[in-house]
Amino acid sequence: MNWLTNVVRPKIRNILRRETPENLWIKCPDSGHLVFYKDVEANQFVIPGSNYHMRMGAVARLKSVFDGETWYDIALPEVTADPLKFRDERRYVDRIKDARAKTGLHDAVKVGYGKLENFPVVIAVQDFDFMGGSLGMAAGEAIVRGMELALEKRAPFILFAASGGARMQEGILSLMQMPRTTVGVQMLREAKLPYIVVLTNPTTGGVTASYAMLGDVQLAEPGALIGFAGARVIEQTIREKLPEGFQRAEYLRDHGMVDIVVHRHDLRSTLARLCRILTKSPAAEIEVVTPEPEPVAEAAVVLPAEAVAPPPAAEAAAPPATPPA
């Protein structure tokens, strides 16, 4: 029996076993309910029911904004992969290789050029799945290149921020990207080109101390964590309890740090409207079809007999004129 139970039965189970995808279900962080992954993906990674906004990858984000889900990928300049030869538990170059294999991205920022409701725009997206969306030399170069393209095309520049801050493996070289991107923002401002920032969950650290909080209009997704230092660090520093909802998008909106909190489903139309307002462009022409009214049969009005007037006598026809002799 040992041979049957220990050898044969496991082999039969392996034959009959069906592999289940790891990402078949997603657990909502807000409600704790399990949701079918395809339903969440089809809903732009917003949990149906709870409306919790999950993190969204760079490619999926660009697809959700650009017309026809098409755009031109912007070639980004190469930078030194590991200038400091940094190593902690693992080598920095190995971490980059793993992040590239996981996300399919070259670095944490992806830049595209296309049309948003037929309006040309340049969009840069930070992907939190690539080493926490951290700001390094490659990410800084990508953002600056996107701003330069916006200047060249005379197009608005839109940035979706999602980051844990500066990339510590690059030291002062990553911190240098903060003033570089700030100079890029100033160039857009001098050219009178709109710079719109969408703060997503999370946006923290040195990113919030530079380009992420310098937009002409600051948008945020519902419930996004936005701040410089963590809440626990602040509480330990000031020795006070922070208010409820501190560093969330709604709290920042109520205290003047964010202009609008926009649901992800409304972001596309909101961004297009802002671009047209800030550039003083006419609204997109929408063909309005007015349905033809259906003819209504007139109801017959019955009058009393005494109110009905007799028809007028027919006038005698005039004799034809006699031509002159």
Swiss-Prot record:
A Pfam family this chain is assigned to: Carboxyl_trans
Assigned keywords, A-Z: ATP-binding, Cytoplasm, Fatty acid biosynthesis, Fatty acid metabolism, Lipid biosynthesis, Lipid metabolism, Nucleotide-binding, Transferase
GO molecular function, one term: acetyl-CoA carboxylase activity
Keyword Lipid biosynthesis included in the entry's annotation: yes
Pathway(s) served: Lipid metabolism; malonyl-CoA biosynthesis; malonyl-CoA from acetyl-CoA: step 1/1
Catalytic activity: N(6)-carboxybiotinyl-L-lysyl-[protein] + acetyl-CoA = N(6)-biotinyl-L-lysyl-[protein] + malonyl-CoA
InterPro entries xref list: AcCoA_carboxyl_beta, Acetyl_CoA_COase_Trfase_b_su, ClpP/crotonase-like_dom_sf, COA_CT_N
Domain CoA carboxyltransferase N-terminal positions: 24-293
Extent of the signal sequence: none
EC id: 2.1.3.15
Compartments, as annotated in UniProt: Cytoplasm
GO terms for biological process, alphabetical: fatty acid biosynthetic process; malonyl-CoA biosynthetic process
Cellular compartments per GO CC: acetate CoA-transferase complex
Described purpose of this protein according to its UniProt entry: Component of the acetyl coenzyme A carboxylase (ACC) complex. Biotin carboxylase (BC) catalyzes the carboxylation of biotin on its carrier protein (BCCP) and then the CO(2) group is transferred by the transcarboxylase to acetyl-CoA to form malonyl-CoA.
Family: Belongs to the AccD/PCCB family.
Self-association and partners: Acetyl-CoA carboxylase is a heterohexamer composed of biotin carboxyl carrier protein (AccB), biotin carboxylase (AccC) and two subunits each of ACCase subunit alpha (AccA) and ACCase subunit beta (AccD).
PANTHER family: ACETYL-COENZYME A CARBOXYLASE CARBOXYL TRANSFERASE SUBUNIT BETA, CHLOROPLASTIC
Listed name of the protein: Acetyl-coenzyme A carboxylase carboxyl transferase subunit beta
Organism: Rhodopseudomonas palustris (strain BisA53)
Taxonomic lineage of the native organism: Bacteria, Pseudomonadati, Pseudomonadota, Alphaproteobacteria, Hyphomicrobiales
